[in-house]
Each structure stands twice: as C-alpha cells, then as structure tokens.
Amino acid sequence: MGVEKVPKYDIPTKKVDYVFIELDKMKPHEQLVQKELEAFIESVTGSGIFWKPMLLAKVPGEDMYLIVDGHHRWAGLQKLGAKRAPSVILDYFSDDVKVYTWYPAFKGDLNEVVERLKKEGLEVIEDPEAEEKAERGEIAFALVGEKSFAIPGGLEEQKKVSKVLDEMSVEGKIELIYYGLKEDAREDMAKGEIDYVFIRKAPTKEEVMELVKRGEVYSPKTTRHVLPFNPDKIDVKLEELF
C-alpha cells in the first residue's frame, strides 16, 4: 500500500474501557486494502488474541457506529465469522478529535503515472493553480512537483487515482509514500526523495458522517484522524468474539 510518514505528535497511551459492539452495527467510511486485510487475518489467527480495540463513533440518528479506526480489523473479523469486537466509543464531534487527510506521493516516472491515470479515464491537465483548486475541493487532486496538474472530479476520481497508485506500487513501477503533512512532502521533494505529491482537501467530520449515512466510502487513506489518546493494548481471546 505504500509507506506512511506520520507527523510526530505527543499523544499519550491511555488505558480505556471498551465495550463489545456487534460487527453488523459498524459502518466503514473507507475502502479496504487487500494486503492489510490479509495481514490482519494472519496475525489474529496466529496469535488468537485481539489486542487493538475498534475506535467507533455513534452515527447521529441511527443505531449504527462509524468506524473511525479499524476497517481491516472489522472486515477481517467478519471474514472469520466473528460477531462482535471490543470497541472504544469516541465523542466524534469533540474538538479533541481532529480529521485530516493523507497526501500520496511517489518517486518514479511522471509520464508513466500520467499515462496510467489517463487509461483509467482521468483527465490530467497542466494548471499552475491546481493546488489552490484542490484545497478548495473544486477538483479531485492536484498533482504537484516540478510542474502542477489538475485532476478534475470528486470521490470516484479519487478512488481511481488510489487504484492506479496502489497497482503501480505493487508492480514496483513507483515508490509510494503517504504523507500526513504537505510540508514534510515538500521537504522530501526538495531533497529528491520524492518526485510528485497528490494534494486534496481534507474531509470534514460532517462530510464523513454524511458519507456513511449514504452508504458510501472514500478511497483508502482519505481520512487521517488524530485523537487525544492512543488506546492501550487489550488482551481479548479471538474465540470470545464469535
């Protein structure tokens, strides 16, 4: 899926109470990455222990929960036939819970990437104002490096970009890195460690909730949630989840 460059935050690890929530009461907001799903299933069946609780938030007006963190744990448990998972319920609209986005970047041949994007039916248009347009949510992505390109569209176009980058990374055609901060991507670009970065507008919490209410999902790694704490490890036997 690519390497993550996570900003350094001083977030405490905290022992928190968890409750068991039925898996069919949970709603995803992002597409899955097959490799991550397989890795979770291998890990949890190998150890027989579920150690990282789901992080959920109540969907307003519904008896359902938004998956804030834990998409692959949720899908993996479902695949194994489990019925529930230990979960920490967050106050999603609290100021302590932040939502940002990830910025996919690559080292590789720009022309090859552009060609693959166009094969997916995407437009890639040179545009010096692409970054500003992306930040305002007027286009799917800005592709920024030595030159600047606009990729028009919305959610569906973002999914196509994600698919192309994932495939090219698996094929070894590009080195794919996800940045939590644009500034870090620019620093690495100046050092020659990456060639281009894709920039998009981060979704708001309201947009995330509206999306799940419609039964839709973002492309993988669209949201980057930052919480006031990291939940401490738990020790729940896998067999207890069936």
Swiss-Prot record:
Mg(2+) binds at D69. O-phospho-L-serine binds at V68, G70, H71, H72, W102, K221, T223, H225. SUPFAM superfamilies: ParB/Sulfiredoxin. Its EC number is 2.7.1.226. This is ADP-dependent L-serine kinase SerK. ADP binds at S43, I49, W51, K52, D69, G70, H71, H72, R73. Its cofactor is Mg(2+). Pathway: Amino-acid biosynthesis; L-cysteine biosynthesis; L-cysteine from L-serine: step 1/2. Keywords: ATP-binding, Kinase, Magnesium, Metal-binding, Nucleotide-binding, Transferase. Changing E36A: Decrease in activity. The gene is serK.
